[in-house]
Amino acid sequence: SQSVFLIKIPAHSRWMFAIGCLVLAAFFFISFFFHRKGILISLVGVLAAILFFINGTYSFQLLGQDEIAWSEPNSMKIEKYKWTDLEEVVLHIPSYEQRRYEGLEHLMVFTFKDGNILTMVRDKAFTDQIGKIDGSIRRYQVEYRTEDM
């Protein structure tokens, strides 16, 4: 959709898909040796892999023109908010030493009026869309500030 300008998929999702593929391959390999139970073993493997695939699918962070949505890893619950539901946005800036030696990155923390919090790493994909994100923050007059880590 054109109204979505950033979707972040955490490493957790990629791991879930990789584990699902390995589980599927392992069950197919095992079913090769057990001819009588091969179909049952394959079916169990497919079902186990599907669980990992579903778990990986429900882990994302989304920023759009109209909404902010995310789902935590290992959760099937999707949190959806409008930009008007935001209380404040805080950019946490690590020091030079923290970035260089500890590998810390800038963090954007979105705090909602109901107390829910979304933390996003401000990486290259985020920075590429910063104009649209800042535009939404200004358009909806959300309090914005920076803090040192």
List each model region and its residues.
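N-terminal membrane-targeting/pre-transmembrane regions
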Residues: 1-32
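N-terminal secretory/membrane-targeting helices
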Residues: 1-8, 107, 112, 149
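Short, structured coil/loop segments at alpha-helix boundaries
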Residues: 10, 34-35, 75, 126, ...
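Conserved beta-hairpin
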Residues: 42-81
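Non-transmembrane, membrane-adjacent beta-strand/coil modules in membrane-associated proteins
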Residues: 72-127
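Terminal and domain-flanking low-complexity segments
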Residues: 121-149
